[in-house]
């Protein structure tokens, strides 16, 4: 180990030197192939040794040059592990490598660069070291490697010295290098291959910032001879050649350098390594500084080609230490390699060679030191010293070697510190070609981000900059990660045009509404261009004064926007960039790093490597530096440089570190890992690394906190480092903490490092690419942004897949805390859950469950999240696993006889779900996320199915929380999840299918929520994905008045009025109908609508009674999946997320649930007696019954016998996800199932007529109705009137919510048979609901969540008038009885509406009574009124990530707001839609991509999550499809009166959490509020939810943004105040567009529409356009005078009018961006040809739209594509063009908001509705429906 340590020290020194040199030289042997890197023999490594070292530091590789045999020896031992690891993780990110510490390190570096770099192992001795050393890590881009400083150490172990020499001999021949590059390319994929060239070095390790350093360290430590270690280059990329080869170790190398004898060299290097650690502490300053002096000459001396000298290229330093003998050969080889590599992209080796051979490039020490300025100086000095001392020290070698190593170590601190800066620079360089870009420096606060950059770009000395940065960061920004970014983020002063834009943007928006920002900016540019010089002068004057004031205030400020952007990008980017992790925090971190370098130069020099590179504190760094380079690495790429050393030091620990690095940006990971590593060497490193890495990279704060702790830790870490693998990981992070203050600033993005780290391991997240791919088996955590804006966002499902449990639990943990919003808010629960579980990730595919949840996490109610967490089988103690579920099923059997049915249903459901998913996928083909979602959903469904089978509902422990926030958890898939109320405390969750989510998260979330709320979180029915059609849940109406001690007043909207538990009669078409008749399904909705219509009066009556009686109407929150699973396959797709739980309802249920959970056995039974007196029920009857039955299973079991066997059907129906109302607090209604607040008549009719109509429909009546019929049986019993239902399988399944009073008799009659059976199934079936889930109902309509909120008096009224989610969408059912259909749609919307009415109106009950009619919705009236406001939000909601998709499932949503989108909704509320459109015309800006959750980052997060979430989001949105109006209606009405505050609260808190992403609207079941994407949503919500929703809404999306903006503004306020900005600003001249002489400036066609002159000529529109232009003031001028480039900023072709004309023009021309002045002249034939193709495609797509509507079905799309395969060779081409054209068309529509929201949702809805809609929607397409779904 001493030898290795020496080597490590030497390696560190070399790395430092190389960093100083800042050129990455792939030394000799590089690992051969990414896959076989371990397997690759040293020869292979050597063969691939040359790595391009290009300006991009990021990819610097430093490969030790060792003879092949040496490498083989060293590599081989570890080769196998590495190989396997690498093979396991071919990608550069070697998360797997973490398994073997050495492998991990190497892998880490590989992982960091997203190319597959092979890690070649040089070291024989230590596996970890070998892994690090042997593994050659390819950096993403070879060029980046050039940038990073590379240290080439050739210090083979004594035994290997001869080999090394031989190796050198081998190397010298050009052929090997020549061949090497090629082989390297093949072995490594992508950049990997070029990096393989780097592979020449025995080990080229591309180490991510921290990991790389660790790896290198490990390599040095572990390898007797250091091979060239190529660091990812993100920090600094040292190339460590065998000690022998490195015979000129910079200081340490020097020893090796002079000593030709490998043994001595090796010993020296090993000694140096060991000493390095020790010297790191002792010799940092003195040796370092000594080295610096040496280095100075050295850098100048570096040119010596033959002598291994440290040569510094302009961009980077390469310190190459070679034995003199080998040097020659090496130099020759290197030269050859250099040539080869230079010619190829692979320059690392070349650079190394260059440095060795060609000192000219390397000779410029200042810049070569890419480290901070100080680093550069230090590096230069070090290089000079190294060169000068190389020979001297070589001679001195042994003792000096160690001293040199120490010096080098010191250098490492110094250079390493510099290196760190360099590393940071390198990392940045890795990101960017240049080693350290000032930006990076800036970004950096970056250790090396811009050593060279700093040299190049910084006006101030690094030290000054660093000091300033440190001061600033430490001052306040450094204090908190979040705080830091704000402080650290100094907005650049506004220039004249920015001020002008600020002043006129509103005017432009006013003048040219509905223009995208790009066009608006162009118009502003035109205006500015037209502004008179004297007016412009005033702007310039003000701008210059602002700038002066700015620089006075921030003298250190540099405008490195590009670098900053890149660094942040890199951060966001997969670890491919060493600083990627640092990226987000990178800018700050790098800056810190730079500061660190400076500090290093000063006292901190020693610590710099750690501190500046990775360590938070320089001091810490210095301590650790010698000992723990990894610390440095952890924090930064610069750390990376040292990381290898540290790695060797840490040896085994490193591997883990590598993993961590890989997951997060290398730096982050290293940091995180290090701390974690000490704690958890391997396993935890992954997770912790992810977490910690995130913390370190993303959040300086965590490190800042640790910094102070960690300073001690750093020392201990140093010691650990010294000791070896122990403290490496942990110590490194502390170091980071210490210096990190500055460095960590960028981390501010992370919300709470603690939470975040707990929540999700950022390290994993850091590399997005690795989410679930084999590349990062580690289970890279999906990216979780931590900015205030993202706090509520769920982790990306991608990453969490790897470690669902950890991620989930962490996530849940953090999310809970993060999401702490108002505890009472159900959404909060949801949020917490969603956020925490990633989860709300119910929709998350099982694999990603933890991170699932795209932005919509919040959508999923806590229950969902919980369920997700529970999904995680580990977490699912109540339901341990899908298999366990069956056991639970047994439990459930106690509750319900239908367990078997449930199981089979579950099984069926998965199939259905899959089908649905497939359908949905087809439907949503246009939707990018949908496919994934579908897949995820399928998985989820399957899992759910497994889980569903046994829904053993534990008796929930009733909590005495008056407002149990039951967060509605939409079930992502339409799988009927068994919602088993796991102890209420924990939350009753339907067992989630996503096992990935750690089980703890759901519980934790619930607990947190409980703690927060002080109320037990409502048992949240985890998202109950009802299998589309088959699964329907009966809403359990809970009566808060229920005698239950815990009975809380109906939370949210259920007020005492609603106390009487409403009877819900759910009539679902039996599966029979679903399977036997899709038409029946379609028909069913019609019938249902008819039926409800028939029974409307009764309903009204009932409602009145119920409203008064039932304090808590049945949970309105009905998570219904699309009904179409079996029925109209189309419904299925919708169904998956269709289940929405009304958070309010949930709350209500929770209040009741608590009662009922306690009483699940009791309360329900009590309810039975109460039910007996249905009217009595009003007081005590908690009519909360959730019966989620797998209709599919039921149907499948009773395919034709549903009607025939009502009772058995009931048993079968035994809700797979039978959520007893109390247990689930949420009801998942099948899409078909409509809960109508039909009065007795409805109930009766519903039970009888509906059932008959619905065909095997089960009527689940509330206890009251059940009581009437089954008063003896127990109100609890859920009566499934299978027989009644069976008779009319054809009718769409409808859930009739019957007033407890009226319906009971009829309902009970129909339902009596099944009631008993169901009762068995449902622990508390007091609701006495008849579940008739025909296939139609089985598919829970997305809109199924009909609010059965008592609303006011008509609380009972909440009906889920969702016969079919699609059916609803498809007004086709309505045709027969459009009013009913409308009603149903309205039921959804009205549910929401009803709630709304309830909220706003007690009259809602009348509407409800009118419910059968569309009016009930208020679709025309109520809906029309409210939807308009909502419609935009709905629209936006659908447009939210998968909201649109969910919309499919949200026919109600369509019906509701843009429900129009939904066919049924459109049909039913077609008028409404128009109203909304017209109404909703209220101009609402189209949601931004971020709001829609479509921003790249969100998209990444949502990829998997979105898929599952698309289901969830549906439900979660409650506003999305179902949820849209339902969530609004459900939520708002539910919460309206009593719970309005809650909802408001929920909304506000949820919004806050949800806020981060518009999806948050979907995220929180709160739905509409969260739909907050659009103002309408907020207004609608506020309407429904009274003031609160609005505030929350506004607060939500706006508040976070506003808060952030506020912070930023505050930053500028001081500057602006100094300038008296406001006064002067107001005095500025106002531009008068009329005065504008640039016609185009006035006319504002959207820029994209503007065509070149050629097009204009082609178009008939041009003359009018010109006329239009002429109409404008100065039209004549441009027209008359030939347009000159100077005349108009955007050129003659830019004119808004033209754009407008052309947009209206249906010629099918594709829009083109405005041409620059010369563009039209440039349009040559080739361009024309291309344009012609584009135009052809556009016209064809328009043709397709004309034939099939804006949302053509998958079948239509495929057929069209095959028909026009010449134009659309691939289906993707057509889909993309469809999406593009549709977006343009919708964008042009006057109702942008509406289009954006409802249409998009309708798009996804339509996709899912396509199936159901195909049957139903076709029948009944009202105006809106026709418009939206005519294509179906």
UniProtKB/Swiss-Prot annotation:
Biological role stated in the UniProt entry: Transcriptional repressor required for the specification of numerous cell types during embryonic development. Required for terminal patterning of early embryos. May associate with gro to repress tll and hkb, restricting their expression to embryonic terminal poles where they initiate correct development of head and tail structures. Required for dorsoventral patterning of oocytes and early embryos. Cooperates with dl to repress zen and other dorsal specific genes within the embryo and promotes expression of the ventralizing factor pip in ovarian follicle cells.
Induction details: Subject to local inactivation by the RAS-RAF-MAPK signal transduction pathway, which leads to relief of target gene repression. This pathway may be locally activated by a variety of ligands and receptor tyrosine kinases (RTKs) according to the developmental stage and tissue. In terminal patterning, activation of tor by the locally processed ligand trk may promote cic inactivation specifically at the embryonic terminal poles. In the developing wing, activation of Egfr by vn may lead to cic inactivation specifically in prospective vein tissue.
InterPro entries documented for this protein: CC-Dev_Transcription_Reg (IPR052412), HMG_box_dom (IPR009071), HMG_box_dom_sf (IPR036910)
GO BP annotations, alphabetical order: dorsal appendage formation; dorsal/ventral pattern formation; epidermal growth factor receptor signaling pathway; eye morphogenesis; imaginal disc-derived wing vein specification; maternal specification of dorsal/ventral axis, oocyte, soma encoded; negative regulation of cell growth; negative regulation of organ growth
GO MF annotation list: DNA-binding transcription factor activity, RNA polymerase II-specific; DNA-binding transcription factor binding; DNA-binding transcription repressor activity, RNA polymerase II-specific; RNA polymerase II transcription regulatory region sequence-specific DNA binding; sequence-specific DNA binding
Classification via Gene3D superfamilies: High mobility group box domain
Protein's organism: Drosophila melanogaster (Fruit fly)
Signal peptide interval: none
Residue stretches of biased makeup (Acidic residues): 397-408, 915-938
Classification via Pfam families: HMG_box
Stated name of the protein: Putative transcription factor capicua
Segments for region (Disordered): 66-121, 135-227, 323-353, 389-427, 444-493, 563-619, 690-739, 784-845, 874-938, 1069-1105, 1151-1178, 1457-1602, 1632-1668, 1701-1733, 1789-1817
Residues with PTM Phosphoserine: 41, 49
Self-association and partners: Interacts with gro.
Low complexity: compositionally biased ranges: 96-121, 187-203, 211-223, 323-342, 446-484, 1092-1105, 1462-1471, 1547-1589, 1800-1817
Compositional bias ranges of the Polar residues kind: 409-422, 1078-1091, 1503-1525, 1789-1799
Start-end of Pro residues biased regions: 172-186
């Amino acid at each position: 180990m001493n030898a290795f340590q020496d080597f490590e020290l030497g390696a560190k020194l070399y790395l430092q030197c190389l960093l100083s040199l800042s050129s990455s030289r792939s030394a000799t042997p590089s690992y051969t192939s990414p896959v076989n890197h371990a397997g690759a023999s040293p020869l292979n490594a050597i063969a691939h040794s040359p790595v391009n070292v290009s300006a991009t530091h990021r990819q610097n590789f430093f490969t030790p040059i060792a003879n092949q045999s040496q490498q083989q020896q060293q590599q081989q031992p570890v080769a196998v592990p590495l190989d396997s690891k690498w093979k396991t993780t071919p990608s550069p990110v070697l998360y797997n490598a973490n398994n073997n510490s050495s492998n991990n390190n190497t892998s880490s570096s590989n992982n960091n660069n997203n190319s597959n770099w092979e890690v070649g192992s040089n070291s024989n001795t230590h596996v970890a070291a070998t892994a690090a050393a042997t593994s050659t890590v390819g950096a993403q881009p070879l060029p980046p490697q050039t940038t990073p400083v590379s240290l080439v150490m050739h210090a083979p172990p004594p035994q290997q010295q001869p080999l090394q020499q031989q190796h050198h001999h081998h190397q010298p021949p050009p052929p090997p290098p020549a061949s090497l590059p090629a082989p390297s390319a093949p072995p490594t994929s992508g950049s990997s291959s070029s990096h393989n060239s780097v592979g020449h070095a025995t080990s080229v390790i591309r180490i991510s910032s921290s990991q790389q350093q660790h790896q290198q360290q490990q390599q040095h430590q572990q390898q007797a001879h250091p091979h060239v270690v190529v660091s990812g280059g993100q920090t600094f990329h040292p190339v460590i050649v065998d000690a022998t080869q490195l015979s000129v170790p910079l200081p340490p190398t020097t020893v090796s350098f002079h000593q030709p004898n490998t043994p001595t060299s090796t010993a020296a290097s090993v000694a140096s390594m060991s000493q390095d650690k020790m010297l790191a502490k002792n010799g940092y300053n003195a040796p370092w500084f000594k080295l610096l002096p040496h280095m100075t000459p050295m850098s100048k001396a570096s040119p010596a080609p033959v002598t291994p000298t440290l040569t510094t290229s302009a961009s980077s330093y390469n310190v190459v230490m070679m034995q003199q003998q080998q040097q020659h050969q090496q130099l020759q080889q290197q030269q050859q390699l250099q040539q080869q590599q230079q010619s190829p992209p692979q320059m690392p080796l070349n650079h190394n060679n260059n440095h060795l051979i060609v000192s000219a490039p390397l000779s410029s020490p200042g810049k070569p030191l890419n480290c901070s300025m100080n680093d550069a100086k230090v590096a230069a000095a070090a290089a000079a010293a190294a060169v000068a001392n190389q020979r001297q020290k070589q001679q001195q070698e042994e003792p000096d070697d160690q001293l040199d190593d120490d010096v080098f170590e010191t250098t490492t601190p110094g250079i390493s510190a510099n290196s760190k800066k360099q590393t940071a620079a390198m990392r940045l360089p890795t990101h960017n070609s240049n080693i350290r870009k000032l930006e990076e420096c800036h970004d950096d606060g970056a250790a090396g981000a811009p050593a060279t950059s700093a040299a190049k770009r910084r006006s101030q000395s690094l030290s000054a900059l660093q000091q300033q940065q440190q001061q600033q960061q430490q001052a306040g920004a450094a204090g908190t990660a979040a705080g830091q970014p704000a402080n650290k983020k100094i907005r650049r002063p506004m220039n004249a045009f920015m001020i002008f834009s600020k002043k006129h943007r509103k005017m432009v928006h006013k003048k040219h509404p509905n223009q995208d920002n790009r066009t608006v900016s162009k118009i502003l540019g035109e205006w500015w261009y037209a502004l008179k010089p004297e007016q412009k002068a005033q702007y310039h004057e003000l701008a210059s004064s602002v700038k002066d004031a700015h620089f006075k205030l921030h003298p250190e400020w540099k405008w490195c926007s590009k670098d900053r952007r890149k660094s942040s990008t890199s951060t966001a980017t997969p670890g491919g960039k060493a600083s990627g992790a640092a990226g987000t925090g990178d800018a700050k971190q790098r800056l810190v790093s730079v500061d660190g370098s400076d500090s290093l130069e000063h006292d901190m020099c020693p610590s710099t490597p750690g501190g500046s590179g990775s360590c938070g504190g320089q001091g810490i760094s210095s301590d650790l530096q010698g000992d723990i380079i990894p610390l440095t690495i952890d924090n930064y790429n610069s750390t990376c440089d040292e990381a290898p050393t540290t790695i060797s030091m840490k040896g085994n620990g490193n591997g883990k570190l590598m993993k961590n690095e890989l997951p997060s940006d290398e730096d982050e990971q290293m940091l995180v890992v290090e701390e974690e590593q000490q704690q958890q060497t391997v396993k935890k490193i992954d997770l912790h690394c992810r977490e910690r890495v995130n913390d370190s990279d993303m959040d300086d704060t965590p490190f800042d906190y640790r910094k102070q702790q960690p300073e001690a830790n750093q020392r201990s870490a140093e010691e650990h480092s010294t000791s070896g693998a122990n403290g490496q990981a942990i110590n490194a992070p502390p170091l980071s903490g210490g210096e990190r203050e500055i460095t960590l600033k960028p981390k501010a993005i992370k919300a709470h490092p603690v939470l975040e780290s707990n929540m999700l391991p950022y390290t994993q997240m850091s590399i997005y690419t690795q989410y679930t791919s084999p590349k990062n088996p580690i289970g890279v955590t999906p990216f979780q942004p931590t900015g205030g804006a993202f706090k509520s966002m769920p982790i990306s499902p991608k990453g969490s897949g790897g470690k669902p449990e950890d991620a989930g639990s962490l996530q849940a943990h953090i999310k809970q805390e993060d999401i702490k919003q108002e505890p009472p808010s159900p959404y909060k629960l949801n949020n917490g859950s969603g956020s925490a579980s990633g989860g709300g990730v119910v929709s998350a595919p099982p694999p990603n469950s933890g991170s699932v949840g795209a932005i919509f996490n919040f959508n999923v109610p806590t229950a969902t999240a919980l369920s997700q967490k529970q999904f995680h089988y580990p977490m699912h103690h109540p339901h341990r696993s899908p298999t366990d579920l069956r056991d639970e099923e047994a439990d459930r059997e106690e509750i319900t006889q239908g367990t078997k049915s449930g199981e089979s249903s579950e099984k069926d459901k998965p199939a259905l779900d899959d089908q649905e998913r497939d359908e949905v996928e087809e439907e949503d083909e246009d939707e990018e996320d949908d496919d994934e979602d579908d897949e995820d959903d399928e998985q989820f469904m399957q899992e759910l199915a497994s889980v569903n089978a046994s829904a053993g509902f534990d008796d929930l422990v009733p909590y005495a929380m008056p407002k149990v926030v039951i967060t509605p958890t939409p079930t992502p898939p339409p799988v009927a999840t068994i919602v088993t109320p796991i102890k209420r405390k924990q939350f009753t969750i339907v067992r989630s299918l996503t096992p990935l989510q750690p089980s703890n998260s759901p519980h934790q979330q619930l607990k947190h929520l409980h703690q927060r709320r002080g109320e037990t979180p409502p048992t949240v029915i985890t998202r109950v994905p009802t299998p589309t059609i088959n699964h329907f849940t009966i809403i359990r109406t809970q009566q808060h008045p229920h005698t239950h001690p815990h009975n809380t007043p109906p939370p949210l909207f259920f007020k005492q009025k609603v106390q009487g538990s409403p009877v819900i009669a759910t009539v679902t078409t039996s599966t029979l109908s679903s399977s036997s008749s899709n038409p029946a399904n379609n028909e069913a909705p019609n019938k249902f609508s008819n039926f409800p219509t028939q029974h409307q009066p009764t309903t009204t009556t009932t409602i009145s009674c119920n409203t008064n009686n039932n304090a808590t109407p049945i949970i309105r929150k009905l998570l219904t999946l699309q009904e179409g699973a079996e029925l109209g396959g189309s419904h299925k797709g919708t169904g998956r997320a269709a289940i929405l739980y009304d958070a309010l309802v949930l709350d209500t249920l929770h209040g009741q649930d608590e009662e009922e959970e306690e009483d699940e056995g009791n309360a329900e039974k009590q309810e039975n007696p109460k039910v007996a007196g249905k009217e009595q029920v009003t007081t005590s009857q908690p009519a909360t019954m959730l019966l989620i039955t797998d209709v599919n299973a039921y149907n499948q079991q009773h395919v034709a016998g549903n009607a025939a066997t009502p009772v058995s059907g009931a048993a079968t129906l035994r809700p797979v996800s039978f959520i007893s109302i109390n247990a689930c607090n949420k009801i998942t209604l099948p899409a078909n199932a409509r809960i109508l607040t039909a009065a007795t008549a409805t109930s009766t009719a519903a039970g009888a007529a509906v059932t008959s109509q619905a065909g095997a429909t089960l009527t689940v009546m509330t206890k009251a109705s059940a009581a009437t019929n089954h008063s003896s049986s127990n109100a609890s019993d859920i009566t499934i009137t299978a027989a009644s239902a069976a008779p009319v399988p054809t009718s769409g399944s409808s859930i009739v919510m019957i007033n407890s009073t009226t319906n009971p008799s009829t309902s009970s009659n129909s339902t009596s048979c099944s009631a008993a059976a169901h009762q068995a199934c449902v622990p508390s079936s007091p609701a006495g609901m008849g579940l008739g889930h025909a296939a139609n109902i089985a598919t829970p309509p997305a809109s199924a969540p009909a609010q059965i909120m008592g609303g006011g008096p008509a609380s009972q009224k909440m009906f889920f008038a969702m016969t079919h989610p699609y059916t609803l969408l498809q007004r086709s059912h309505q045709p027969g009885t459009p009013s009913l259909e409308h009603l149903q749609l309205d039921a959804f919307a009205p549910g929401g509406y009803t709630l709304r009415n309830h909220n706003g109106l007690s009259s809602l009950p009348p509407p409800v009574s009118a419910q059968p009619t569309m009016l009930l919705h208020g679709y025309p009236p109520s809906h029309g009124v409210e939807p308009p406001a909502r419609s935009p939000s709905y629209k936006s909601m659908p447009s939210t990530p998968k909201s649109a998709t969910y919309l499919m499932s949200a026919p109600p949503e369509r019906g509701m707001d843009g429900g129009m989108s939904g066919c049924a909704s459109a049909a039913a509320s077609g008028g409404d839609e128009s109203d909304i459109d017209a109404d909703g015309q209220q101009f609402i800006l189209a949601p931004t991509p971020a709001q829609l959750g479509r921003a790249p980052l969100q998209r990444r997060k949502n990829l998997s999550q979105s898929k599952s979430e698309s289901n969830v989001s549906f439900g979660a949105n409650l506003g999305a499809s179902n949820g849209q109006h339902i969530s609004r209606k459900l939520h708002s009405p539910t919460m309206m009166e009593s719970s309005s505050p809650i909802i408001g609260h929920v909304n506000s808190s949820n919004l806050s959490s949800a806020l981060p992403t518009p999806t948050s609207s979907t995220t929180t079941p709160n739905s509409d509020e969260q739909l907050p994407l659009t103002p309408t949503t907020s207004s609608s919500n506020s309407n429904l939810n009274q003031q609160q929703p609005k505030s929350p809404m506004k607060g939500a999306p706006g508040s976070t943004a506003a808060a952030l903006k506020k912070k930023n503004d505050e930053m500028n306020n001081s500057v602006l105040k100094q300038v008296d900005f406001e006064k002067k600003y107001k005095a500025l001249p106002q531009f008068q567009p009329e005065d504008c002489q640039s016609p185009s400036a006035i006319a504002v066609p959207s820029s994209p529409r503007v065509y070149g002159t050629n097009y204009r000529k082609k178009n008939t529109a041009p003359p009018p356009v010109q006329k239009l232009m002429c109409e404008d003031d100065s039209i004549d001028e441009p027209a008359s005078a030939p347009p000159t480039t100077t005349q108009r900023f955007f050129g003659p072709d830019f004119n808004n009018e033209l754009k407008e004309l052309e947009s209206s023009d249906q010629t099918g021309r594709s829009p083109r961006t405005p041409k620059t002045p010369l563009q039209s002249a440039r349009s040559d034939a080739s361009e024309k040809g291309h344009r012609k193709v584009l135009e052809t495609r556009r016209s064809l797509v328009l043709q397709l739209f004309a034939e099939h509507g804006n949302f053509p079905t998958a079948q239509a799309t495929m057929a069209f594509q095959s028909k026009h395969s010449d134009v659309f060779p691939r289906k993707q081409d057509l889909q993309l063009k469809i999406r593009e054209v549709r977006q343009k068309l919708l964008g042009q529509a006057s109702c942008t908001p509406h289009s954006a929201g409802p249409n998009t949702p309708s798009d996804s809805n339509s996709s899912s509705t396509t199936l159901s809609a195909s049957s139903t929607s076709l029948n009944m397409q009202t105006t809106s429906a026709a418009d939206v779904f005519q294509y179906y």
